[in-house]
Amino acid sequence: MVAIVTLTRQVLLTIALALFAQGAAIPEEAAKRDDNPGFVALDFDVLRKPLNLTEALLREKRDSISLSLINEGPSYASKVSVGSNKQQQTVIIDTGSSDFWVVDSNAQCGKGVDCKSSGTFTPSSSSSYKNLGAAFTIRYGDGSTSQGTWGKDTVTINGVSITGQQIADVTQTSVDQGILGIGYTSNEAVYDTSGRQTTPNYDNVPVTLKKQGKIRTNAYSLYLNSPSAETGTIIFGGVDNAKYSGKLVAEQVTSSQPLTISLASVNLKGSSFSFGDGALLDSGTTLTYFPSDFAAQLADKAGARLVQVARDQYLYFIDCNTDTSGTTVFNFGNGAKITVPNTEYVYQNGDGTCLWGIQPSDDTILGDNFLRHAYYLLYNLDANTISIAQVKYTTDSSISAV
């Protein structure tokens, strides 16, 4: 989910990476070795909505994308606590945005939005809350917005607390629940609707975790688990070495806003298609997106057809009975290679048709249908690298700090 940070000033296809459910326990043996192992592990729940163009034709979450993106698939929600009295919030973890905001207990929810069902925050009941008196505004590309006030308070993630964390207390929103953005600080929503900077860029949650000694490196790894799984894990400052095969290959980030690495080529149905440009890895985006010309090459090979679904809006559809055997291979600039089963590219729509899992856009985005197979995603914001390896779906765990 990527926040739109206009000079007015937010993010869903994103992340919308926003945090995930039931905190994952640190392995007992690690706890015995060191009370502070240098990482914080957190489980999350996978929240799924079916793709349905009749209800939500197009959704997108970033200002740099002119063609709307579909985000009716999974999102990733986790429980965190805010305040001296640990007020519990279930928030979406989002790698594409950078701000942590919660829903105020007196917030006004947009029409048809139940924004308070995942937990609310009452600043006056937290003795550690400090109102910064600056306006917070963030806008998503799908038109949803959140407004409120910047403040600081204690944030607790799976029993690990950081103090004085800058957060936004949202009093008006058309978003379903709060979002924990964990991207670069350069992508923070620090401008109001007139383009005036209301607060300086600040230490967001990953940065604060490092500065307060909870993790050793401003990095996090993401395990989205299998397509049918109900839970996954994010580890701040660590990596689970049991969750991938082969070795992690570090790819240099080519753009910090958003997190982009170089994609060299794509192999599909026996043909190799050279690409040679940047690709954004975004946990808040459901499908995979390529510029129109490149998407057309892949579509021709896959047998997908372009259909006009709205004014100036085209999507690829594919026969629901198409042969989904085989794989699509993504080759990255520094040698990383990720194999994705072709079952990830046929999506049942609500009307009996099937969407193709690759769609046209002005920008290249590798969404959840790619990321589920690319564990490990180790985002190292200190080294400006994203390390990836082929996923290994397993309940085994072997976490180490990075």
Curated annotation (Swiss-Prot):
Disulfide bonds join 109-115, 320-354. Residues 76-389 form the Peptidase A1 domain. Its EC number is 3.4.23.24. SUPFAM superfamilies: Acid proteases (SSF50630). GO terms for molecular function: aspartic-type endopeptidase activity. Residues 26-62 form a propeptide. The active site is at 94, 282. It comes from the Eukaryota. The keyword Disulfide bond applies. O-glycosylated. GO terms for cellular component: extracellular region. The keyword NAD does not apply. It catalyses: Preferential cleavage at the carboxyl of hydrophobic amino acids, but fails to cleave 15-Leu-|-Tyr-16, 16-Tyr-|-Leu-17 and 24-Phe-|-Phe-25 of insulin B chain. Activates trypsinogen, and degrades keratin. Its main location: secreted. Keywords: Aspartyl protease, Cleavage on pair of basic residues, Disulfide bond, Glycoprotein, Hydrolase, Protease, Secreted, Signal, Zymogen. Glycans are attached at residue 52. Residues 1-25 form the signal peptide. It is found in: Secreted. Pfam families: Asp (PF00026). One of its GO terms (biological process) is proteolysis. InterPro entries: Aspartic_peptidase_A1 (IPR001461), Aspartic_peptidase_AS (IPR001969), PEPTIDASE_A1 (IPR033121), Peptidase_aspartic_dom_sf (IPR021109), SAP-like (IPR033876). Belongs to the peptidase A1 family. This is Candidapepsin-1. It comes from Candida parapsilosis (Yeast).
